Amino acid sequence: MSDGAAARRWGKCGHSCSRESIMVAFKGVWTQAFWKAVSAEFLATLIFVLLGVGSTINWGGSENPLPVDMVLISLCFGLSIATMVQCFGHISGGHINPAVTVAMVCTRKISIAKSVFYIIAQCLGAIIGAGILYLVTPPSVVGGLGVTTVHGNLTAGHGLLVELIITFQLVFTIFASCDSKRTDVTGSIALAIGFSVAIGHLFAINYTGASMNPARSFGPAVIMGNWANHWIYWVGPIMGAVLAGALYEYVFCPDVELKRRLKEAFSKAAQQTKGSYMEVEDNRSQVETEDLILKPGVVHVIDIDRGEEKKGKDSSGEVLSSV
């Protein structure tokens, strides 16, 4: 076959493979159930941001500000998210948080294509929710509209670490509460997640405003045009969420099927490695001493990857989650 023919064949194959990969990635996207789930994420995030951020408005105004009521804010955010999870969890999984969605992708709970639409819906919902709050709030008390900011005595690194920690405890709570392998969970999952959000606020409001949710910070920032240290509220929560999801799913409570597949893979690799060593020893016994002296640079490469790869079960089941 000529080089030109080979190139044309490879081009057709590459184009076909690429198109097929895209179709597989977006499988299930154009369904009614999918768009219901995306709409649920949009509406849930809108309501959550509207109610939660609304609790941060200081009605004393800038001239006579009232003391920050941490308990009020913490309970409002916690109860709001618990309510949204209870309402929309069975429709979309109740992520309501881009950090949670990214953690679900990293633990293979949802597809990348679905996560993209979820995050877009969450961000749009947060913007609309913050916009509605801005419209219904008197200009004299709107203040910063609940934009999350790092305390003046803290560095950006401190703020990043605080957001990582509080999001870690939230997402770990989500994975633990929604674990279908557990039989000891008898209470309300939504309430457990709500308590986790409230705890994070009680601890971190004075540090960073206690975001734990990139969309919650994104909506008010867009409306007010305040982007000071905004990257912290994306990087910190996403890092904490991915770390929590990975530790729970692959270290503390790994799936039985996943453990079995990993055990088989390691066992197969060990057998192949052992066989390659035996082959090297057999070849070495046939080499004459003079060959070793005359050809010191000869290297024998043994292919140990001839075993057929076994496809594992795709664990893409939805997980109830929040914030």
Curated annotation (Swiss-Prot):
Entry-annotated residues carrying Phosphoserine: S111, S180, S276, S285, S321
Name the lipidated positions (S-palmitoyl cysteine). Answer: C13, C17
Q: What is known of its domains?
A: Aquaporins contain two tandem repeats each containing three membrane-spanning domains and a pore-forming loop with the signature motif Asn-Pro-Ala (NPA).
Provide the protein's localization: Cell membrane; Basolateral cell membrane; Endosome membrane; Cell membrane, Sarcolemma
User: Its biological function?
Assistant: Forms a water-specific channel. Plays an important role in brain water homeostasis and in glymphatic solute transport. Required for a normal rate of water exchange across the blood brain interface. Required for normal levels of cerebrospinal fluid influx into the brain cortex and parenchyma along paravascular spaces that surround penetrating arteries, and for normal drainage of interstitial fluid along paravenous drainage pathways. Thereby, it is required for normal clearance of solutes from the brain interstitial fluid, including soluble beta-amyloid peptides derived from APP.
List the ranges annotated as motif NPA 2.
213-215
CDD domains for this protein: MIP
What is one term from the GO cellular component aspect held by the record?
Answer: sarcolemma
GO molecular-function terms, A-Z? water channel activity
What's this protein's name? Aquaporin-4
